[in-house]
């Protein structure tokens, strides 16, 4: 086996060395680049991978005791506002012409008389009912005397609760994507001009 490998290597060396020397003596031959069109591969369909839902047990937070915060009352001094003088505003009388309303004529409506026959109710006779008087003899109830009950004091030893170790709860950071709000278009609002009546001030005496 070793001799066969040695013979193969020897033959390869004898063939390769002269070929290499021949290639070294010849100048390099220019070969233009060959255009290879890109190979288009059809898309491979990959079915979606379904992941089973992961159950996360709810994290119980112990109630936190917050002592009440005492806020002292804040003294606010009374605010004194000086009287504001408002001159009388003269309003000229507004003349409204009388509105003519023609009289409305309603034709008379005829209502025939309604005949109601008289209703006869015969008298109902109720015989008198005799109720004899009920006599109840007096009932004697002797006074009830209850002796005092002695209750010895009950000793309750103090209850000692060992400290409970609560491991810290790890909360992973929650990623909140930025919220993009589209711009809201507000059409221009037309405001008609406001006409203010002239204000007449008090008359000035010379």
UniProtKB/Swiss-Prot annotation:
A GO MF annotation of the entry reads: structural constituent of cell wall
Tissues and organs where the protein is expressed, per its UniProt entry:
Expressed in hypocotyls, roots and mature root nodules.
Question: For this UniProt entry, what's an example GO CC term?
Answer: extracellular region
Q: List the InterPro entries hit by this protein, alphabetically.
A: Adhesive_plaq, Extensin-like, Proline-rich_CW_protein
Region annotation (Disordered) ranges: 51-84, 132-206
According to the record, where are the sequence repeats?
Answer: 32-36, 37-41, 42-46, 47-51, 52-56, 57-61, 62-66, 67-71, 72-76, 77-81, 82-86, 87-91, 92-96, 97-101, 102-106, 107-111, 112-116, 117-121, 122-126, 127-131, 132-136, 137-141, 142-146, 147-151, 152-156, 157-161, 162-166, 167-171, 172-176, 177-181, 182-186, 187-191, 192-196, 197-201
So which residues are the signal peptide here?
A: 1-22
Q: Does the keyword Repeat apply?
A: yes
UniProt superkingdom: Eukaryota
What does the record give as the function of this protein? This is a developmentally regulated putative cell wall protein.
Q: Which family does it belong to?
A: Belongs to the plant proline-rich protein superfamily. ENOD12 family.
Query: Any idea what this protein is called?
Result: Repetitive proline-rich cell wall protein 1
Organism from which the protein derives: Medicago truncatula
């Amino acid at each position: 086996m070793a001799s066969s490998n040695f013979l193969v290597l020897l033959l390869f060396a004898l063939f390769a060395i002269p070929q290499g020397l021949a290639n070294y003596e010849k100048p390099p031959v220019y070969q233009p680049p060959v255009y290879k069109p890109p190979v288009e591969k059809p898309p491979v369909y990959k079915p979606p991978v379904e992941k089973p839902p992961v159950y996360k047990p709810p994290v119980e937070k112990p109630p936190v005791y917050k002592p009440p915060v005492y806020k002292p009352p804040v003294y606010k001094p009374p605010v004194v506002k000086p009287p504001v003088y408002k001159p009388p505003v003269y309003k000229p009388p507004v003349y409204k012409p009388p509105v003519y309303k023609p009289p409305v004529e309603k034709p008379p409506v005829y209502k025939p008389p309604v005949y109601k026959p008289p209703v006869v109710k015969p008298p109902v006779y109720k015989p008198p009912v005799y109720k004899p008087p009920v006599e109840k003899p007096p009932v004697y109830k002797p006074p009830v005397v209850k002796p005092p009950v002695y209750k010895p004091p009950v000793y309750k030893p103090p209850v000692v609760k060992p400290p409970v170790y609560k491991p810290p709860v790890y909360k992973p950071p929650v990623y909140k994507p930025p919220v993009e709000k589209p711009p809201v278009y507000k059409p221009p609002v037309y405001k008609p001009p406001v006409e203010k009546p002239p204000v007449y001030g008090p008359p000035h005496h010379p």
